[in-house]
């Protein structure tokens, strides 16, 4: 990967981790102060706003990244495309607010707490004006990360300062909204320095041309959104609330790990879109090959670690009462590898090529398999069955997308480098397995296992002269000498 891609990846990774840490730090405090009733009310209203946001966004954020990245070297065209997409998003947001008002004045449960509902709806406006997609498309990750992390730090301080008792629900909602989209107002103000709307007339704008392709992304988003909630919903109907709780504990840990792994995708999408639109196919293939190998390099030990350390991890993060989550975590952990591969081939290869119809087919296949597996496995195996269903469905999606994307790839997916990662992971597994038999606290067991496992895995890759291990080692030596 080029230097700028490495830097962008690190910055995006920092941004992703900060997004994961904010709720981990603030939620335990907020839940004790506001109690289940206050937290539940905010979450309920926020989930409704979330669905309205999904509809009003119409797939624009993901679509806009690709379209702006294509023309980012042409200042006039970049300005025009950005203005068109921003205008379209604002129009859709206007209709979204009409829906917000209708719901607020017709649904009794929401009408009783309109200030809270309207406060949370601020995310609709800030998301439209925030043009987060523009900064991703132009790869301005330094600005994105500094703003996002700063806002989250301020929001965390504000939450601990202002949320003092169970009546501070509005403060909690406002702070959470600001932590999520508060930096968007700065994005909008800064946009004036990045584009020039005087280069074209209003009559030249053609927002209609963006509707059809954005609708395709909206369809994809809807399928993915349904698929993500499917296990929990079906488990809730077919089994108990406790089963949902056990599944959620395992699922959240896996999704957090997956978010760290897939943070590279946010960096690669604009770069790949630009390479394809400008005809730099050789650069595209070279970067894609290296990025895929990096994904496998990280995903394999991550999956192995979660499977082997499921017991102490659940013990630390959820407590001993969540013991049934241990086999659930072990069953669902493989999706890190499966989703990593399928997501890379779908969103970093097929989507930049304009093959979103194929991506929709892959997502649909995954969802159908998930439904079938859930119907078969949940009645007998409860939350473990739901976890197995997730892994099987994501495996099927990975197989389908490998088959579909294969004809467009100019690099080998599986080679000797991947074999080294498998062998290195196997050696790491042996070491971690023996450490796991130690008689010590869960936290110590996790820390020692992760440290020793990482060292063993890294040393093996260094001995085999792996590109990433050698690069990381040279960077470490350079920093150490400096």
Task: Specify the residue positions occupied by each region the protein language model found.
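Signature of the first transmembrane helix
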Residues: 4-62, 97, 101, 156, ...
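Membrane-proximal transmembrane or re-entrant/amphipathic helices at the cytosolic face
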Residues: 433-482
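Hydrophobic alpha-helical transmembrane segments
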Residues: 114, 121, 145-193, 213, ...
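Helix-loop junctions and terminal segments of transmembrane helices
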Residues: 28, 57-73, 250, 254-299, ...
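Interfacial segments at transmembrane-helix termini and the short loops linking adjacent helices
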Residues: 104-120, 306-338
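Interhelical loop/hinge segments that connect adjacent transmembrane helices in multipass membrane
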Residues: 1, 169-173, 185-228, 267, ...
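N-terminal membrane topogenesis motif
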Residues: 1-24, 76-79, 191, 204-220, ...
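Membrane-interface junctions at transmembrane-helix termini in multi-pass inner-membrane proteins
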Residues: 114, 124-148, 334-365
């Amino acid at each position: 990967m080029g230097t700028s891609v490495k830097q962008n990846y690190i910055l995006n990774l920092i941004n992703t981790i900060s997004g994961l840490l904010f709720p981990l730090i603030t939620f335990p405090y907020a839940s004790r102060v506001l109690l289940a009733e206050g937290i539940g009310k905010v979450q309920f209203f926020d989930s409704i706003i979330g669905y309205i946001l999904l509809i009003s966004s119409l797939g624009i954020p993901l679509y806009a990244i690709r379209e702006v990245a294509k023309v980012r070297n042409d200042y006039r065209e970049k300005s025009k495309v950005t203005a068109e997409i921003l205008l379209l998003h604002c129009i859709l947001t206007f209709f979204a607010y009409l829906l917000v008002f209708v719901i607020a004045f017709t649904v009794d449960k929401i009408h009783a707490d309109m200030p809270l509902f309207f406060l949370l709806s601020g995310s609709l406006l800030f998301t439209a004006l925030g043009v987060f997609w523009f900064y991703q498309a132009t790869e301005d990750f330094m600005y994105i990360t500094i703003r996002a992390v700063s806002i989250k730090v301020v929001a965390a301080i504000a939450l601990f300062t202002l949320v003092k008792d169970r009546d501070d629900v509005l403060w909690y909602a406002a702070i959470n909204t600001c932590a999520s989209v508060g930096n968007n107002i700065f994005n909008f103000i800064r946009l004036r320095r990045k584009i020039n709307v005087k280069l074209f007339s209003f009559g030249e704008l053609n927002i209609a041309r963006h509707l059809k392709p954005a609708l395709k992304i909206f369809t994809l988003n809807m399928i993915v959104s349904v698929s993500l909630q499917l296990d929990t919903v079906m488990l809730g109907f077919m089994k108990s609330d406790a089963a949902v709780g056990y599944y959620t504990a395992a699922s959240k840990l896996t999704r957090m790990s997956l978010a760290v792994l897939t943070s590279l995708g946010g960096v690669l999408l604009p770069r790949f879109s630009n390479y394809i639109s400008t005809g730099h196919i050789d650069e595209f293939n070279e970067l894609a090959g290296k990025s895929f190998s990096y994904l496998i390099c990280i995903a394999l030990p991550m999956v192995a670690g979660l499977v082997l350390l499921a017991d102490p991890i659940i013990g630390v993060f959820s407590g001993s009462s969540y013991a049934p989550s241990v086999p659930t975590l072990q069953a669902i952990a493989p999706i890190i590898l499966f989703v990593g591969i399928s997501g890379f081939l779908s969103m970093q290869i097929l989507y930049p090529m304009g093959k979103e119809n194929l991506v929709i087919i892959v997502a649909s296949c995954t969802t159908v398999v998930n439904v079938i597996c859930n119907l078969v496995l949940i009645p007998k195996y409860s939350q473990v069955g739901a976890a197995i269903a997730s892994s099987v469905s994501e495996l099927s999606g990975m197989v389908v997308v490998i088959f579909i994307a294969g004809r467009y790839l100019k690099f080998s997916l599986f080679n000797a480098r991947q074999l080294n990662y498998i062998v290195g992971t196997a050696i790491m597994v042996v070491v971690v397995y023996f450490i796991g038999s130690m008689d010590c606290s869960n936290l110590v067991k996790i820390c020692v296992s992760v440290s020793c496992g990482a060292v063993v895995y890294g040393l093996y890759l260094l001995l085999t002269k792996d590109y990433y291990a050698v690069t990381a080692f040279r960077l470490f030596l350079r920093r150490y000498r400096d």
